[in-house]
Amino acid sequence: GPDIGGPVGPYVQSERMGMFKQYAEQLVAEGKAYYCFCTEERLEALHAEQRANGEMTHYDGCCRDLPEEEVRQRLAAGEPYVIRQKIPKEGVTGFDDVVYGHIEVENSEMDDQILIKTDGMPTYNFANVVDDHLMGITHVIRGSEYLSSTPKYNLLYQAFGWKIPTYIHCPPVMKDAQNKLSKRNGDASYQDLVAKGYLSEAVMNYICLLGWSPKGEYAEQEIFSLEELIKIWSPDGISKSPAIFDPLKLRAINAEYIRRLSPEEFQKKAEPWIDQAVHTPIDKKLLCANLQPRCEVLGEIPEQLDFFDAMPDYDVSLYTNKKQKTTPETAREALEALLPLLSDESLDFSDRDTVFNACKAKAEELGKKNGWLLYPLGIALSGKQRTPGGGTDLACMMGRETTLARVKAAIEKLNG
């Protein structure tokens, strides 16, 4: 590759430019290509006339059969030129594709494509064929939009007497029914998705399922390790129809990958995102234990944690919850009942279960359900309805000092 070199370098296109013209001139010498001296003005006029007549624009072969002497004179005079491939005028050119099968095109429908431009640079198609041959490429895997140009590729391989590679044309990935995914239009790339907090393995898994489906015993399976994909992937499963990129499906697969991480793996991946939002001491292990079952995309973690560093302003109407049978009035009562319990130095905040059981016992003592007591605690500690964990979880993440300060502030707010 370009970074480490190798036996078929150079691997940077600009460093290979000198080799293409000699291959084009070889085809000219063998009568399989020719010099074309047509000016831009002539070609523009030709195409305008063809369009006016309702024809597809194409080169008319004006320079295809120029006498050799005239060609030599014009070259000697320094006249600008391109080198064009001499496409047969009759017959058909066919090729076999692993996905689309055997395809044939009438030679009369193909243009004498340019191989070398006036500046001496090769065209994309010509450079591709020469590079692939010299680098020993055996399989050409590319988008189905290149199906139409493949016959010209094959004619070049045949002209040189080179072995034709195996073609695998893949359907495009669409943004919707009409538009292809395009970086130019702001659609996310692999790197963008990883930067947003999608797991690399999940993105790879999802992308593999775009336009491809497993067979046999794996037909209903959606989650695959890289090792499994390497083992079972086959071009037989590639669809001819375009695939539509479904961000919700990617999200679901990513969430499943997150759930399958060990607690230690999840914390390692989540910590950089946690550190973006939280700069005060918290129990990260407990936080991650609560985040992991709820997390779908790592990049969405910071917005869930914005209350740890500073308590946001909130409306006391948040304490109203029909399911938990709470109101601002009952919330004040609940928090006042919790305050002595949470102030007890013997209560170990490093043990979440101990704190929860103590709160549960207090609820039973009051003749109330757990939610009646703990829902207000969660609001008092976060100022939010949705948080990564319940009231006792948040208390243990924050520690006794912060918990007591926020509970006291909440009681004061409710009294105000």
Feature-to-residue mapping (PLM):
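A glycine-rich helix N-cap at a beta->alpha junction
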Residues: G1-P7
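Conserved phosphate-binding loops in nucleotide/dinucleotide-binding enzymes
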Residues: P10-S14, F37, I116-K117, M135-Y146, ...
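Active-site cores that bind ATP or allylic diphosphates and position pyrophosphate for catalysis
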Residues: Q13, Q26-H169, K175-L181, S189
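A generic secondary-structure signal for well-formed alpha-helical elements
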Residues: V28, K32-Y35, H47-Q50, G54, ...
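Structural motif
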Residues: L193-E201, K240-D246, V278-L287, E364-W372
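Short alpha-helical scaffolding segments that buttress acidic/His motifs in well-ordered protein cores
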Residues: Y206-I207, W233, N254, C288-C295, ...
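Small-residue-rich helix-loop
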Residues: P263-L366
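Charged substrate- and nucleic-acid-binding regions of tRNA-handling and nucleotidyl-transfer enzymes
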Residues: D353-N415
